Amino acid sequence: MPECMDKYKNDFAIEFAKIMQENLPQWKTLQKKHINALWKGEKLFWYIGCFLFAYLPGKRELNYDLNFHIFMSIMIVIFGIIIVFFCENKDYQNEIKKSLFPKLLKVFGKDIEYVAGSDFYELSNKVNYRSGYISHSIYDNSMLFNKPVSYDSPDDIFSGTFKNCPFIISETNITNVKRYNNGKSDSFTLFNGIAMLFKMQKKIKSHVLIYSKGLFKNKVPKDFEKVEFEYEKFNKKYDVYVQKSQMEARGQIEARYLFNTAFMDRFMQLHTSFKISKMKCSIYKGSMLVLLATNKDLFELNNMFYRIDDMNQYKKLFDEFASVFSFLEVLNLSSKTGL
């Protein structure tokens, strides 16, 4: 973790403990309620239904195998319990986060807000650094996807201003839906992970794309040319492309103006902080969109069978929050001159 975040660590721990102490009784009641809900009411009928369903004979089943159906009934019930636990636990965590995160984030700045994914559809369909919504047009104009965005399903959304830089951070799943004339459709996952939108004061006219290198070559849009830097450590991990313009050298010049050694070091630092495999970025019209691909569920608390007052939770949360805010702090995106 960068040293620039050390000044927040102690205040974060104190605030976490304070909020925990104030809310612990009601959170324990909430925890007990969700645990009990696993075995009561409609959930119980769901398990019984799953159990009995497995005993139904198949259409082409000639010889009824009781042992097989007993095995299947047990497996289906286990699967049903897992589904119910996942849904119930998610509801429990979201309720805790709604009361914890808004207060906890004030450690980093008074203007930072949190919105749970369950409240996402109450937001307007516009980019707004206060409402915390990244519109589909921003994703599409970034040119980081080869298909248009049809849906995005955020889990956690953070927005506001940090170090004079407006930002939106959205843990989300982005999907493209292809519809056919017969009424059928196919869904394609375009992205799963953390999307971060930052407003930059430094203006560049060119469109710049950054891709982390992997086993397969990145698919780059037409009319983009590669930019090579003298920093070999960065070149080994990333490919940078700039959109060609009528002024042939302008894109290359602007990319080199933006990508000084400090910028490249900090960009690599963000990649390693979240321990993700793929990362891509679009810099366009005064905004920077960073996509960190990961299947890990970030910004999460302990599940409902663990202690709510486990103070070790704050360490994980602090590391994840600090990784993002340190990126803003060290990149100095609010600067109009240097990075």
Regions found by a protein language model. Name each.
Residues 1-41:
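Cytosolic juxtamembrane N-terminal segments of multi-pass membrane proteins
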Residues 30-33, 37, 72, 88, ...:
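Amphipathic coiled-coil alpha-helices
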Residues 36-52:
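Transmembrane alpha-helical segments and their cytosolic interface motifs
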Residues 45, 58-77:
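Hydrophobic alpha-helical transmembrane segments
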Residues 79-104:
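Transmembrane-cytosolic junction motif
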Residues 102, 106-108, 118-176, 184-339:
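Charged, low-complexity intrinsically disordered regions
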Residues 180:
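A surface/extracellular/periplasmic glyco- and lipid-processing/surface-interacting theme
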